[in-house]
C-alpha cells in the first residue's frame, strides 16, 4: 500500500530498476548487514541490561503501572501531538509532514535503555516502557496516523511495518528474559555482565554516531527546516516528558527515565515504514530527516549523560567538604522529609553520611543504660 501525500503527488510502486541516489544506494547495500548486526548487538545489549532488572520491582511496575501509564501517555500522546504542532508551525510540505508525523508515532527505541542506565534511572521502568510501547505500536501507530491525517488528502493508507515491530519485540523480550533469569540465579555475575554491556553499548553508540555523521555529509544542505526539526523534536520530547512525569508526582528517578524514553524514538522502524510507502525519488527528500533525528537523539543523550555525571560529581564533592555537624544536620532534615526524593540527581548518600550510635549498643537491640539510670541500678 502506498501513500499519496497530496492530490498532485503520485506515489507509484517502487521498482528494482529505479535509480537510487548515492546516499540511499550505499544505505540500501548495507541495509541487510546493518539489520543483522544491529539485531545481534541489540540482543546482547538488552541481555546485559536485563541483568539489572529485579523480578520484584518489575512485578511492582506491572501490578501498579502508574509509571508505565505516564510513559505511554507521553509516547503516544505527546510525541504525535508535538510532531503535528511542528508540522503546522513550520508549514511543511506534504511529504515532509508525513515523515515527521511517522517519527512522532513510532514507539520508543532501545537507545533510551542504555542512556537510562548511565543516568541512574529506573531500569525496570525503562525496559517495561520500551516493551509496552513496541507492543502498543501494533495498534497505536495506525490509530495516531489515522487521527492526525483525517484532514489530509491521503488516497491510500501508509504501510505499517508489522514485521519490523515483531522482530523488535523478539529482540527485546527474549534477551531481557534471559538477563532477568541470570540476575535472579547469579546476582554477582550479572553485575559484571551489566558493566561489560554498558561499555559495549557506549562503543556501539559511538560507532553508530560516527557512521551517521559520515552518511549525513550529503544531506546537511538538503533542507535546513527538516534539520532544525530533527534537532528540536527530541529535545521538546525530553522536556515535555519530564514535565508530565513531574506533574504526575513521579520520583526524580522515574522523571529522568520517562524523559529519556519520551524523546528517543525507534528510527529504524520509521525508515522501514517510509521505505515501504514511498519511491526512492521521494525517499531521498526525507531520508536526511530520519538520519538526522537518529544522530541528534544520540548526541542529546550523550549530552544529558555528561551533564548528569558532572553535576553528580560536583554534588559529591560538595558533600564531601562539609563538616560533620553540617552533614548530620542535613541528614536529620532528610530523615524528617516525607518526600520520596530530595534532589534531582537522587544521589543516595544517606548510608555514608548517617551518624553512628553515640554509645555502646546491646546486641539484642536494647540500648545500654547510662547516666543516672545506671547508677540507680
From Swiss-Prot:
GO terms, molecular function: bile acid:sodium symporter activity
Catalytic reactions of this protein: estrone 3-sulfate(out) + 2 Na(+)(out) = estrone 3-sulfate(in) + 2 Na(+)(in); 17beta-estradiol 3-sulfate(out) + 2 Na(+)(out) = 17beta-estradiol 3-sulfate(in) + 2 Na(+)(in); dehydroepiandrosterone 3-sulfate(out) + 2 Na(+)(out) = dehydroepiandrosterone 3-sulfate(in) + 2 Na(+)(in); androst-5-ene-diol 3-sulfate(out) + 2 Na(+)(out) = androst-5-ene-diol 3-sulfate(in) + 2 Na(+)(in)
Topology in the lipid bilayer: Multi-pass membrane protein
NCBIfam families (alphabetical): bass (TIGR00841)
PTM comment text: Glycosylated.
Pfam families: SBF
Topological domains annotated Extracellular: 1-29, 89-97, 155-159, 217-223, 279-285
Residue intervals annotated with topology Cytoplasmic: 51-67, 119-133, 181-195, 245-257, 307-377
Gene3D superfamilies: 1.20.1530.20
Species of provenance: Bos taurus
Gene Ontology biological process terms, A to Z: bile acid and bile salt transport
PANTHER family reported for this sequence: SODIUM-BILE ACID COTRANSPORTER (PTHR10361), SODIUM-DEPENDENT ORGANIC ANION TRANSPORTER (PTHR10361:SF55)
Entry similarity comment: Belongs to the bile acid:sodium symporter (BASS) (TC 2.A.28) family.
Name by which UniProt lists this protein: Sodium-dependent organic anion transporter
Compartment annotation: Membrane
Membrane-spanning parts: 30-50, 68-88, 98-118, 134-154, 160-180, 196-216, 224-244, 258-278, 286-306
Residue positions with a glycan: 4, 157
Function noted in UniProt: Transports sulfoconjugated steroid hormones from the extracellular compartment into the cytosol in a sodium-dependent manner without hydrolysis. Steroid sulfate hormones are commonly considered to be biologically inactive metabolites, that may be activated by steroid sulfatases into free steroids. May play an important role by delivering sulfoconjugated steroids to specific target cells in reproductive organs. May play a role transporting the estriol precursor 16alpha-hydroxydehydroepiandrosterone 3-sulfate (16a-OH-DHEAS) at the fetal blood vessel endothelium.
Region (Disordered), start-end ranges: 319-377
GO CC annotation, single: membrane
This protein's UniProt keywords: Glycoprotein, Ion transport, Lipid transport, Membrane, Sodium, Sodium transport, Symport, Transmembrane, Transmembrane helix, Transport
Amino acid at each position: 500500500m502506498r501513500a499519496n501525500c497530496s492530490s498532485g503527488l503520485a506515489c507509484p510502486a517502487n521498482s528494482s530498476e529505479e535509480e537510487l541516489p548515492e546516499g540511499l544506494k550505499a544505505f540500501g547495500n548495507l541495509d541487510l548487514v546493518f539489520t543483522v548486526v544491529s539485531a545481534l548487538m541489540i540482543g546482547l545489549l538488552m541481555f546485559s541490561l536485563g541483568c539489572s532488572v529485579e523480578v520484584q520491582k518489575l512485578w511492582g511496575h506491572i501490578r501498579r503501572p502508574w509509571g508505565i501509564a505516564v510513559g505511554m501517555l507521553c509516547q503516544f500522546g505527546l510525541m504525535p501531538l508535538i510532531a503535528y504542532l511542528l508540522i503546522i508551525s513550520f508549514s511543511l510540505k506534504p511529504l515532509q509532514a508525513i515523515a515527521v508525523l511517522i517519527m512522532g508515532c513510532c514507539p520508543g527505541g532501545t537507545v533510551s535503555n542504555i542512556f537510562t542506565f548511565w543516568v541512574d534511572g529506573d531500569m525496570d521502568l525503562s525496559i517495561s516502557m520500551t516493551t509496552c510501547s513496541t507492543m502498543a505500536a501494533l495498534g497505536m501507530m495506525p490509530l495516531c496516523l489515522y487521527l492526525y491525517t483525517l484532514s489530509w488528502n491521503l488516497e491510500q493508507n501508509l504501510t505499517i511495518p508489522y514485521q519490523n515491530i515483531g522482530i523488535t519485540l523478539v529482540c527485546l523480550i527474549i534477551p531481557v528474559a534471559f538477563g532477568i533469569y541470570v540476575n535472579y540465579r547469579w546476582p554477582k555475575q550479572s553485575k559484571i555482565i551489566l558493566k561489560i554491556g554498558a561499555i559495549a553499548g557506549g562503543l556501539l553508540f559511538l560507532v553508530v554516531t560516527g557512521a551517521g555523521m559520515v552518511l549525513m555529509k550529503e544531506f546537511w544542505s538538503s533542507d535546513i527546516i527538516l534539520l532544525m526539526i530533527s534537532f528540536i523534536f527530541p529535545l521538546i520530547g525530553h522536556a515535555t516528558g519530564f514535565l508530565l512525569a513531574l506533574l504526575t508526582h513521579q520520583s526524580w528517578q522515574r522523571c529522568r527515565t520517562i524523559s529519556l524514553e519520551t524523546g528517543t524514538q525507534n528510527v529504524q522502524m520509521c525508515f522501514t515504514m517510509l521505505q515501504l510507502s514511498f519511491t526512492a525519488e521521494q525517499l531521498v527528500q526525507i531520508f536526511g530527516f530520519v538520519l538526522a533525528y537518529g544522530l541528534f537523539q544520540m548526541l542529546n543523550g550523550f549530552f544529558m549523560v555528561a551533564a548528569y555525571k558532572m553535576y553528580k560529581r560536583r554534588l559529591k564533592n560538595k558533600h564531601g567538604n562539609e563538616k560533620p555537624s553540617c552533614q548530620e544536620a542535613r541528614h536529620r532534615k532528610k530523615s524528617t522529609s516525607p518526600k520520596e526524593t530530595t534532589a534531582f540527581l537522587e544521589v543516595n548518600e544517606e548510608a555514608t553520611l548517617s551518624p553512628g550510635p553515640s554509645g555502646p549498643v546491646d546486641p539484642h537491640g536494647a540500648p545500654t543504660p547510662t547516666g543516672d539510670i545506671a547508677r540507680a541500678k
